């Protein structure tokens, strides 16, 4: 078990997660829906940072917000969060109206560089996102969970 005191500078980490962690939070939400179990977002983030699957600058993290919580490998992060090996993500620009698999959406603005925000069809980590309001749907990411072997 990881105690709160085992998480160095947790307030800095929570700040960065709030500013730049929408994809990671969205992946946690998907993992919770797949496993039907709650995820401790901060502890999971720390473990994934230690595994080098999330970017995070320990020293003065608020000065490195753009690097904070960049997800290096969505599939490995989902596998870690769900405990399911072989889980994959398919990127598409069109989504079938009959799609049954879990998916999330990437919104992007046309600014340079573009601003992005990741959401579920029925959940966003922000009450109000200017990126969603002013941007457009850039792509969909469908989660493919491998069938269980008997």
Residue ranges and their predicted role:
Residues 57-121:
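...with weaker cross-activation on analogous glycine-rich loops/strands in unrelated enzymes
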Residues 36, 87-89, 127:
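Substrate-binding/catalytic groove segments of enzymes
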Residues 1-65, 144-149:
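Active-site-adjacent structural segments surrounding the nucleophilic cysteine of cysteine proteases
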Residues 17, 79-82, 131:
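Compositionally biased, low-complexity repeat tracts
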Residues 19, 96-103, 107, 118-150:
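Noncatalytic regulatory segments and standalone regulatory/sensor domains
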Residues 9, 15, 43, 58, ...:
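Low-complexity, compositionally biased segments
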């Amino acid at each position: 078990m990881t105690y709160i005191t085992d998480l160095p500078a947790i307030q800095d980490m929570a700040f960065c997660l709030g500013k730049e962690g929408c994809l990671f939070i969205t992946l946690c939400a998907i993992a919770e829906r797949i496993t039907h179990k709650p995820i401790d977002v901060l502890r999971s983030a720390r473990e994934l940072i230690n595994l080098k699957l999330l970017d995070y600058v320990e020293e003065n993290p608020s000065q490195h917000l753009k690097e904070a919580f960049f997800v290096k490998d969505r599939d490995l992060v989902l596998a870690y969060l769900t405990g399911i090996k072989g889980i994959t993500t398919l990127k598409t620009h069109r989504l079938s109206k009959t799609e049954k698999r879990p998916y999330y959406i990437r919104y992007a603005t046309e600014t340079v560089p573009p601003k992005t925000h990741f959401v579920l069809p029925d959940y966003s980590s922000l009450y109000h996102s200017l990126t969603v309001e002013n941007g457009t749907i850039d792509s969909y990411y469908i989660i493919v969970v491998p069938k269980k072997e008997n």
